[in-house]
From Swiss-Prot:
Positions bound to substrate: T19, A20, S21, G22, K23, T24
Catalytic activity as recorded in UniProt: adenosine(37) in tRNA + dimethylallyl diphosphate = N(6)-dimethylallyladenosine(37) in tRNA + diphosphate
InterPro entries associated with the record: Dimethylallyltransferase, IPT, P-loop_NTPase
Protein name: tRNA dimethylallyltransferase
Entry's family note: Belongs to the IPP transferase family.
Organism: Burkholderia pseudomallei (strain K96243)
Keywords: ATP-binding, Magnesium, Nucleotide-binding, Transferase, tRNA processing
Assembly behavior: Monomer.
Regions annotated as coiled coil: none
Annotated site (Interaction with substrate tRNA): T108, R130
NCBIfam families per the UniProt record, alphabetical: miaA (TIGR00174)
Function comment: Catalyzes the transfer of a dimethylallyl group onto the adenine at position 37 in tRNAs that read codons beginning with uridine, leading to the formation of N6-(dimethylallyl)adenosine (i(6)A).
Superkingdom to which the source organism belongs: Bacteria
Length: 324
């Protein structure tokens, strides 16, 4: 963004954080003080029928405060970062035009990165390249492809799990098609004529001062999901002929582990432990993304008054009192 555009840009507050950091509570608390509308930055919340395992805001919460980009895609379909970016920019403009305040809230850092920095004309998916990578993975395993990625794009590999097949494949595909690492392409600044050029995104990040506290929350939340009927939710999805574990929706944390349990591949205790471990790994990757944002305003999500602190930080951003 040029200095001229930066001076005239409209500030957009963003509430980011890992799983179980208290984003929903803080967003709803802010909504009690200001006329906000929440734009979800969460790749799992877009899917219909996936409510318990994604910790989707309740009907009452969504009735009290307008939420956007939730329940917009069938689990059999894909939803890309490019689609999110276009939808989010449109919604930010529409919400502001109504005289209300948009609040971006979520934990899908790739979406946030795409929104704020653009996609820089990343190439479209190439079926032939993907088929080759799938064959390589079938022969060598995704950890081997992750190691390959680390050799050409260490920054991207560092934030991906060795079995994150979808993102490893995409990062390798981008490199094979462009000859450039995805991290370099994403780091390029957006053009001044980009739709986001008139916006200044300011992230407030909920981060743990004590990792063990967040881990305990993750375990408690996963157990609460199980008690709320998560296995039944996955069983309903599993009965659909058009859903399978290769889909992005079924790669969401917890869903794969529950599906494998229903397939008889693991017992209940192992499923629970794997679900909690996968969530902790997701949290680790989310924090890696956040800590690469020097402009963020950090709020300790482990503090007893974390919600109050987060609301105060967001109000400072919206009132123009946050650091430039």
């Amino acid at each position: 963004m040029s200095e001229r555009n930066a001076a005239s840009a409209r500030t957009v507050a963003c509430l980011l954080g890992p799983t179980a950091s208290g984003k929903t509570a803080a967003a709803l608390a802010l909504a009690a003080r200001r006329p906000i509308e929440i734009v979800s930055v969460d790749s799992a919340l877009v899917y219909r029928g996936m409510d318990i395992g994604t910790a989707k805001p309740t009907r009452d919460e969504r009735a009290a405060v307008p939420h956007h980009l939730i329940d917009i895609v069938d689990p059999a379909d894909a939803y890309s970062a490019a689609e999110f970016r276009a939808d989010a920019l449109r919604l930010v403009a529409q919400i502001a035009a109504r005289g209300r305040t948009p609040l971006l809230a979520g934990g899908t850092m790739l979406y946030y990165r795409a929104l704020t920095q653009g996609l820089n004309d990343l190439p479209a998916a190439d079926p032939d390249v993907r088929a080759t990578l799938d064959a390589d993975a079938a022969r060598d395993g995704w950890p081997a492809l992750h190691a390959r990625l680390a050799g050409i794009d260490p920054a991207t590999a560092a934030r991906l799990a060795p079995n994150d097949s979808q993102r490893i494949q995409r990062a390798l595909e981008v490199y094979l098609l462009t000859g450039q690492p995805m991290s370099a392409l994403l780091a390029a600044p957006p053009r001044d004529d980009d739709a986001a050029a008139g916006l200044r995104f300011v992230p407030v990040a909920l981060e743990p001062s004590e990792r063990a506290v967040l881990h305990a929350r993750i375990a408690a939340r996963f157990d609460a999901m199980l008690e709320a009927g998560f296995i039944d939710e996955v069983e309903r999805l599993r009965r659909r002929d058009d859903l399978h574990l290769g889909l992005p929706s079924m790669r969401c944390v917890g869903y794969r582990q529950a599906w494998e349990y229903l397939d008889g591949c693991t017992d209940y205790r192992t499923m629970r432990d794997k679900g909690i471990f996968a969530t902790r790994q997701l949290c680790k990757r989310q924090l890696t993304w956040l800590r690469a944002m020097p402009e963020r305003i950090v709020v300790d999500c482990c503090a007893p008054d974390a919600t109050v602190r987060a609301v105060d930080a967001l109000e400072r951003v919206l009132d123009g009192r946050a650091p430039a």
